[in-house]
Amino acid sequence: MYWLTQSLLSSWKHFLDADDAYADAALSSFLSTLRREEKETTQAMQAGIDFEAAINSTVAGVPIEPVSEKYDQAIAKFSRICSGGQPQVPVAGRLHVSGLDFQLYGVCDYVKAGVIYDIKRVQRYEYGKYLHSPQHPMYLHLLSGASKFTYLIFDGANTYAETYRRGDFDPIEDTISCFINWLLANGYINDYFTHWEMNTERMDKIDGIQSC
């Protein structure tokens, strides 16, 4: 059985969608993720971590230092939406696809009243940015009680929301099948087998999670 996360699938999709000028860098980034290599935290990654942490603190009633008017307004808006929800909800489940058994795993930023919320801090936003993301198909598959998935997005100036409901997208099995076929066709399947096989640490992560 093999471990599979939306982060790995998203890294692969990012490579597939990259413009020619960025294809080499996107492939390098994906292979680094595939091979579980340590990565330095980039400025963009840290901005996302800090933004989510500020929302978590605000939801928990912990005061935060003001940053800027638009930033603080985004924090307040998203905190109101997430308030009363359950934070950091782990989800897991097994799937058999392309002749392989997978253990899917993820963590929802917030779950509230049947809605999964995921917080995104981006540099640039275009409508439909997450249309083909594997995150909402995977998480809605894993959390059967949720009816929809909403991305809460802040680009430094404005806030946005993208919502997806069941039936709006292809099942996660289709993405996994394409992913495995691509790995096979391009000679990377052994990297996946080597670095993503189930182990004790991963079993401990899913211990106690009600699987789909």
Q: Language-model features: where?
A:
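Metal-dependent nuclease catalytic cores that hydrolyze phosphodiester bonds in DNA/RNA
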Residues: 1-107, 200, 209-212
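A general marker of short, structured functional hotspots
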Residues: 11, 18, 26, 47, ...
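Mg2+/Mn2+-dependent nuclease catalytic core
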Residues: 91-189
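Non-catalytic C-terminal interaction segments of nucleic acid-processing enzymes
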Residues: 178-212
